[in-house]
Curated annotation (Swiss-Prot):
Its EC number is 1.8.4.12. Keywords: Metal-binding, Oxidoreductase, Zinc. It is an enzyme of class 1 (oxidoreductase). The gene is msrB. Belongs to the MsrB Met sulfoxide reductase family. Binds 1 zinc ion per subunit. The zinc ion is important for the structural integrity of the protein. Zn(2+) binds at C49, C52, C98, C101. This is Peptide methionine sulfoxide reductase MsrB. InterPro entries: Met_Sox_Rdtase_MsrB (IPR028427), Met_Sox_Rdtase_MsrB_dom (IPR002579), Mss4-like_sf (IPR011057). The lineage of its organism: Archaea, Methanobacteriati, Methanobacteriota, Stenosarchaea group, Methanomicrobia.
Protein backbone atom coordinates (compact mmCIF):
# COMPACT_ATOMS: atom_id res chain seq x y z
CA UNK A 1 0.00 0.00 0.00
CA UNK A 2 1.27 3.48 -0.88
CA UNK A 3 2.27 5.69 2.01
CA UNK A 4 0.42 8.89 2.96
CA UNK A 5 0.80 11.74 0.49
CA UNK A 6 3.52 14.31 1.05
CA UNK A 7 2.93 17.90 0.08
CA UNK A 8 5.69 20.51 0.26
CA UNK A 9 6.21 23.91 -1.25
CA UNK A 10 8.71 24.15 -4.08
CA UNK A 11 10.98 26.10 -1.72
CA UNK A 12 10.85 23.18 0.73
CA UNK A 13 11.73 20.74 -2.07
CA UNK A 14 14.65 22.95 -3.11
CA UNK A 15 15.98 22.84 0.44
CA UNK A 16 16.03 19.02 0.63
CA UNK A 17 17.00 18.03 -2.93
CA UNK A 18 20.23 18.62 -4.82
CA UNK A 19 19.92 21.00 -7.79
CA UNK A 20 20.01 18.04 -10.21
CA UNK A 21 17.39 16.13 -8.22
CA UNK A 22 15.18 19.20 -8.09
CA UNK A 23 15.48 19.71 -11.85
CA UNK A 24 14.50 16.11 -12.64
CA UNK A 25 12.05 15.33 -9.84
CA UNK A 26 10.20 18.63 -9.62
CA UNK A 27 10.75 20.23 -13.04
CA UNK A 28 10.42 17.03 -15.11
CA UNK A 29 13.98 17.15 -16.38
CA UNK A 30 16.03 14.25 -17.70
CA UNK A 31 19.55 13.28 -16.70
CA UNK A 32 22.12 12.45 -19.36
CA UNK A 33 22.03 8.77 -20.37
CA UNK A 34 24.66 6.50 -18.78
CA UNK A 35 25.47 9.19 -16.19
CA UNK A 36 23.45 8.02 -13.19
CA UNK A 37 25.09 6.08 -10.38
CA UNK A 38 22.24 3.56 -10.17
CA UNK A 39 22.30 2.70 -13.86
CA UNK A 40 25.21 0.32 -13.26
CA UNK A 41 23.98 -0.97 -9.89
CA UNK A 42 23.74 -4.78 -9.79
CA UNK A 43 23.10 -5.20 -6.06
CA UNK A 44 19.93 -6.74 -4.66
CA UNK A 45 17.58 -4.35 -2.93
CA UNK A 46 14.78 -1.84 -3.26
CA UNK A 47 14.73 1.33 -5.34
CA UNK A 48 12.91 4.21 -3.68
CA UNK A 49 11.75 7.69 -4.64
CA UNK A 50 14.69 10.03 -3.99
CA UNK A 51 12.31 12.78 -2.87
CA UNK A 52 10.12 10.96 -0.35
CA UNK A 53 11.55 7.47 0.17
CA UNK A 54 8.53 5.51 -1.05
CA UNK A 55 9.51 2.02 -2.24
CA UNK A 56 8.99 1.78 -6.00
CA UNK A 57 10.97 -1.00 -7.69
CA UNK A 58 12.70 -4.23 -6.73
CA UNK A 59 16.11 -5.11 -8.12
CA UNK A 60 14.48 -8.38 -9.19
CA UNK A 61 12.64 -6.48 -11.96
CA UNK A 62 15.63 -4.39 -13.13
CA UNK A 63 17.03 -5.26 -16.55
CA UNK A 64 19.59 -3.96 -19.02
CA UNK A 65 17.70 -2.04 -21.69
CA UNK A 66 20.71 -0.34 -23.27
CA UNK A 67 19.01 3.05 -22.99
CA UNK A 68 21.33 4.58 -20.39
CA UNK A 69 18.75 4.81 -17.61
CA UNK A 70 17.78 2.22 -14.98
CA UNK A 71 14.98 0.10 -16.44
CA UNK A 72 12.45 -2.10 -14.69
CA UNK A 73 9.69 -4.30 -16.06
CA UNK A 74 7.35 -3.78 -13.10
CA UNK A 75 6.70 -1.68 -10.00
CA UNK A 76 6.51 -3.10 -6.47
CA UNK A 77 2.81 -2.24 -6.43
CA UNK A 78 0.68 -0.36 -8.95
CA UNK A 79 -0.40 2.12 -6.28
CA UNK A 80 3.20 3.38 -5.89
CA UNK A 81 3.17 5.32 -9.17
CA UNK A 82 0.76 7.37 -11.23
CA UNK A 83 0.87 7.47 -15.01
CA UNK A 84 0.16 10.59 -17.08
CA UNK A 85 0.10 11.23 -20.80
CA UNK A 86 3.13 13.32 -21.80
CA UNK A 87 3.13 14.96 -25.23
CA UNK A 88 6.15 17.20 -24.67
CA UNK A 89 8.95 17.51 -27.22
CA UNK A 90 6.62 16.36 -30.02
CA UNK A 91 6.54 12.83 -28.60
CA UNK A 92 3.71 10.75 -27.17
CA UNK A 93 4.90 9.12 -23.96
CA UNK A 94 3.56 8.03 -20.59
CA UNK A 95 5.13 9.85 -17.65
CA UNK A 96 5.71 7.99 -14.38
CA UNK A 97 5.37 9.97 -11.14
CA UNK A 98 5.59 8.94 -7.50
CA UNK A 99 2.09 8.54 -6.07
CA UNK A 100 3.21 9.77 -2.66
CA UNK A 101 4.90 13.08 -3.52
CA UNK A 102 4.11 13.63 -7.21
CA UNK A 103 7.76 13.74 -8.27
CA UNK A 104 8.72 12.94 -11.86
CA UNK A 105 10.52 9.61 -12.14
CA UNK A 106 10.71 8.92 -15.87
CA UNK A 107 8.54 7.24 -18.50
CA UNK A 108 7.08 3.81 -19.22
CA UNK A 109 7.16 2.19 -22.64
CA UNK A 110 5.60 -0.97 -24.04
CA UNK A 111 8.84 -2.50 -25.31
CA UNK A 112 10.03 -4.29 -22.18
CA UNK A 113 10.60 -7.96 -21.46
CA UNK A 114 8.10 -10.53 -20.26
CA UNK A 115 6.17 -10.99 -18.08
CA UNK A 116 4.80 -7.42 -18.38
CA UNK A 117 6.16 -6.18 -21.70
CA UNK A 118 6.77 -2.82 -20.01
CA UNK A 119 9.96 -0.80 -19.62
CA UNK A 120 9.92 1.71 -16.80
CA UNK A 121 12.76 3.99 -17.89
CA UNK A 122 13.64 5.89 -14.72
CA UNK A 123 16.12 8.68 -14.08
CA UNK A 124 18.81 7.42 -11.71
CA UNK A 125 18.79 10.74 -9.85
CA UNK A 126 15.08 10.19 -9.13
CA UNK A 127 15.89 7.05 -7.18
CA UNK A 128 17.35 6.04 -3.87
CA UNK A 129 18.52 2.49 -3.17
CA UNK A 130 18.32 0.32 -0.08
CA UNK A 131 20.61 -2.70 -0.27
CA UNK A 132 19.13 -6.04 0.70
CA UNK A 133 20.67 -6.99 4.01
CA UNK A 134 22.67 -10.18 4.11
CA UNK A 135 20.75 -12.45 6.46
CA UNK A 136 23.67 -14.82 6.88
CA UNK A 137 21.47 -17.76 5.91
CA UNK A 138 22.75 -20.17 3.34
CA UNK A 139 20.71 -20.53 0.19
CA UNK A 140 18.93 -23.82 -0.03
Amino acid sequence: MAQNKIEKSEEDWKSVLTPEQYHVLRQKGTERPFSGNLYYNKEKGIYTCAACGQELFSSDTKFESGTGWPSFYDVISSDRVRLHEDNSYFMKRIEVVCSRCGSHLGHVFEDGPEPTGQRYCINSVSLGFTKEEDTGKEKE
